[in-house]
Swiss-Prot record:
It comes from the Bacteria. Belongs to the UPF0114 family. One of its GO terms (cellular component) is plasma membrane. It holds the Pfam family UPF0114. It comes from Shewanella oneidensis (strain ATCC 700550 / JCM 31522 / CIP 106686 / LMG 19005 / NCIMB 14063 / MR-1). It is a multi-pass membrane protein. Keywords: Cell membrane, Membrane, Transmembrane, Transmembrane helix. HAMAP family: UPF0114. It is found in: Cell membrane. The keyword Transmembrane applies. This is UPF0114 protein SO_3997. PANTHER family: UPF0114 PROTEIN YQHA. The chain crosses the membrane at residues 10-32, 53-75, 136-156. The keyword Cell membrane applies.
Length: 162
């Protein structure tokens, strides 16, 4: 009975495989939104102010960072929790594949969240005159929370690896 239970439990990791594959659909959606934004600004780029162009650029960078985060979670999550990725010898392999354990992945995800939060905060500061002070305070507090959490996770990871 114990062997059957353990085999079933071990096999249940494959439930995560379609979830990781589903993240690729989210990635596709981000790609569509990215190019939708590009095609939206192209006809009006000469009429845009510099501030508006910077804000659009920050939004595009934000989408790119989220996309990178999705790729990192998809691949390393699959490798850590489901099965090793067997890409052919003739295809190029990402240098970090197989090297991110769950602790490293958490740190990279936390760093990505801080970077994404920083982009959002920069967008807020560029439009500061149109945003309530209370909202700015909350954005700052949330960002500081992300930064402190990422720092604490990195510190704890460093302490446990000693």
């Amino acid at each position: 009975m114990e062997k059957i239970f353990e085999r079933l439990m071990y096999a249940s990791r494959w439930i995560m495989a379609p979830i990781y594959l589903g993240l690729s659909l989210v990635l596709l959606g981000l790609g569509i939104k990215f190019f939708q934004e590009i095609f939206h600004i192209l006809p009006i780029i000469f009429e845009m102010t510099e501030v508006d162009l910077v804000l659009v650029t920050l939004s595009l960078i934000d989408i790119t960072l989220v996309g990178g985060l999705i790729v990192m979670v998809m691949f390393s999550g699959y490798e850590n929790f489901v099965s090793q990725l067997d890409v052919g010898e003739d295809s190029e392999k990402l240098s970090w594949l197989g090297k991110l354990d769950s602790g490293s992945l958490k740190n990279k995800v936390a760093a990505s969240i801080v970077a994404i939060s920083s982009i959002h905060l920069l967008k807020i500061f560029m439009d500061v005159k149109n945003i309530d002070n209370d909202k700015i305070m909350w954005y700052l507090l949330i960002h500081i929370t992300f930064v402190l959490s990422a720092f604490a996770m990195g510190y704890l990871d460093k302490m446990t690896r000693k």
